């Protein structure tokens, strides 16, 4: 072996993780997005936003969701193709079930008639321009996690619904406002 009098990497400083920008979709922004989405050529866009905000679903999970994996009676869905490769069952909100029933049944069995992530992004970007709401679709998951936390859901419940395997990642998604905390202290 080669003898080195000191570690040549001693002078290298470890990079810090960048500060994470907390962002959620405010209720008035959500209302605007849903209203304009209803007028979009993409008849599935309103449902997609609801699935993100109400159910914490990822874009890819929404695109791949099949009608045969939705239980309308129990208001649940089984997501077979998820980001981390494990399937999970989730609850669906009443307004998601209602909106889902309005959409036509697609020949290929998918709940939304969107062929790809690119197509999804095209219509969502168009919606951002129409509304002036510059928050990414992924922000719907932050919104979901934050609202659930403020509504008293346990970490286990939020994690099970949203598919987070790592508590530190889930923590990055949950943004509790100071005004909410002050209201809790007042009660």
What are these regions (language model features)?
Residues 4-59, 63, 73, 83, ...:
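Basic, Lys/Arg- and aromatic-enriched nucleic-acid-binding interface segment
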Residues 11, 32-33, 64, 98-102, ...:
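Short, solvent-exposed alpha-helical surface patches in well-structured domains
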Residues 3-4, 154:
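Conserved hydrophobic residue
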Residues 32-40, 71-115, 126:
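Basic, alpha-helical nucleic-acid-contacting "clamp/cap" segments
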């Amino acid at each position: 072996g080669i003898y080195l009098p000191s570690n040549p990497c001693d002078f290298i400083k470890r990079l810090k993780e960048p500060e994470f920008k907390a962002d959620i979709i405010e209720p008035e922004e959500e209302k605007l997005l849903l209203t304009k989405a209803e007028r979009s050529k993409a008849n599935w866009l309103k449902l997609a936003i609801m699935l993100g905000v109400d159910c914490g679903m990822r874009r890819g999970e929404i695109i791949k969701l099949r009608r045969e994996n939705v239980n309308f009676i129990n208001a649940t869905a089984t997501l077979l193709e998820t980001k981390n490769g494990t399937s999970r069952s989730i609850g669906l909100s009443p307004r998601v079930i209602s909106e889902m029933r309005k959409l036509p049944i697609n020949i290929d069995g998918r709940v939304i008639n969107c062929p790809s992530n690119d197509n999804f992004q095209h219509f969502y970007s168009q919606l951002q321009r129409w509304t002036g709401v510059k928050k990414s679709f992924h922000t719907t998951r932050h919104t979901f996690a934050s609202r659930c936390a403020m509504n008293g859901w346990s970490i286990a419940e939020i994690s099970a619904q949203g598919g987070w395997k790592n508590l530190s990642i889930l923590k990055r998604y949950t943004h509790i406002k100071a005004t909410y905390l002050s209201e809790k202290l007042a009660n």
